[in-house]
Regions:
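Active-site rim/loop-helix segments in enzyme catalytic domains that contact anionic ligands
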Residues: 1-64
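Metal-dependent de-N-acetylase/amidase catalytic core
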Residues: 12, 48-176
């Protein structure tokens, strides 16, 4: 996750929420054995075309040496999501250049980028499908670790995010 999530709550102040969101992400990642790297930018302070932001993501990519990248859809609803999508696209290429200056020497491989569904899958036509039947339970357990965000989505947007994930996942299963 690129953002601290510091603005995403009705009651919890930003500094406190930053800590909570980082702990929730670490807990969720721990369920799947994932090292969580993130919280590089405050909410609504992520802008595409920003070299410093791109360079932070270049460092993450060069550090992780991924086999593939999953990022936000370029047409998502949230300005941070669309900016991250573009920054990841740009950084994924820059990270492959051996002479591109960064905190890591080893260049990353040029790998596929996969875009997630935007919120509720609106106006998105997948070109590839992955059967997540065996992982949906873990996915939901990981999602439920993000308690402060689930509460925020319910209170701010009226969205039961857990139900939406189940519904959208089932729909994509039928679709393929």
């Amino acid at each position: 996750h690129a953002s601290t999530g510091n603005l995403g709550h009705v009651v919890i102040p930003p500094d406190e929420l930053t800590t909570i969101r980082a702990e929730e992400a670490k807990k969720a990642g721990g369920l799947a054995g994932i090292e969580v790297i993130g919280g590089m930018f405050d909410d609504l302070n992520i802008f595409d075309g920003n070299k410093a932001a791109r360079d932070k993501l270049v460092d993450v990519i060069k550090y992780a040496q991924p086999d593939f990248i999953i990022t936000h859809n370029p047409d998502d609803y949230m300005p941070d999501h669309t900016a991250v999508s573009r920054l990841v696209f740009d950084a994924s290429f820059a990270a492959t250049l051996p002479n591109y200056k960064s905190g890591y020497e080893k260049a990353a491989a040029l790998v596929p980028i996969y875009y997630m569904d935007p919120l509720a899958g609106v106006d998105f036509q997948p070109t590839e499908y992955v059967d997540i039947s065996a992982e949906i339970g873990l996915k939901l357990k990981m999602l439920n670790c993000h308690e402060s965000q689930l509460v925020w989505m319910k209170e701010h947007d009226g969205i039961d995010f857990s139900d939406m994930v189940k519904t959208c996942s089932k729909y994509r299963g039928y679709q393929c």
